[in-house]
Regions:
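Terminal connector regions
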Residues: 98-127
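Beta-sheet-dominated interaction scaffolds and their linkers
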Residues: 21-48, 54, 125-128
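Buried hydrophobic-core signal for structured, non-transmembrane domains
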Residues: 47-53, 90, 104-109
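Bacterial Sec-dependent N-terminal signal peptides
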Residues: 1-24
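Surface-exposed binding patches on compact interaction domains or structured appendages
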Residues: 56-87
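Short, acidic/polar linear motifs in exposed loop/turn regions
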Residues: 54-57, 96, 112
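Short, hydrophobic beta-strand segments
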Residues: 88-96
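Hydrophobic core residues within well-ordered beta-strands of beta-rich domains
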Residues: 45-47, 86, 102, 117
């Protein structure tokens, strides 16, 4: 009975380990973008975060959530094949916001080995 239980545990562990080796994995070129200093006369700025699926299975972005309504992410919902690149476009709209330094986060959730990654945008908006 002990041998059977031990063999079953080893089989489950082995299958779990093998499945983990065939996961998707997201790798971003950069995780922070600095818009620098800009005037509140021109409050809308955009950037693109580029990533690669360095895993062995298709990468699916399940959800992207920004920390503020002033930050709008957009992305292609199709799976990214292993070795392929994808992008996440982020628009910051500082209209009606107080001048000064800001730092916003964008949380990316995937089916990858690391399920959650945080991206950041920051800058300084000057007043009139």
């Amino acid at each position: 009975m002990k041998k059977f239980l031990l063999m079953t545990l080893m089989l489950v562990f082995g299958l779990t380990f093998a499945a983990a080796q065939n996961q998707a994995e997201i790798k971003f070129d950069k995780v922070t973008y600095d818009f620098g200093t800009f005037s509140d006369d021109n409050p809308v700025h955009k950037t693109t975060f580029t990533f690669t699926n360095v895993g062995k299975a298709p990468l699916v972005i399940n959800q992207i959530v920004a920390s503020c309504g002033c930050t709008i992410p957009s992305y292609d919902k199709r799976p990214i094949a292993p070795g392929q690149k994808g992008t996440i476009d982020v628009t910051y709209n500082g209209t009606g916001k107080f001048p000064g330094h800001f730092k916003k986060s964008i949380t990316v959730r995937t089916n990858g080995k690391i399920e959650m990654t945080r991206l950041y945008i920051e800058g300084v908006m000057t007043g009139k």
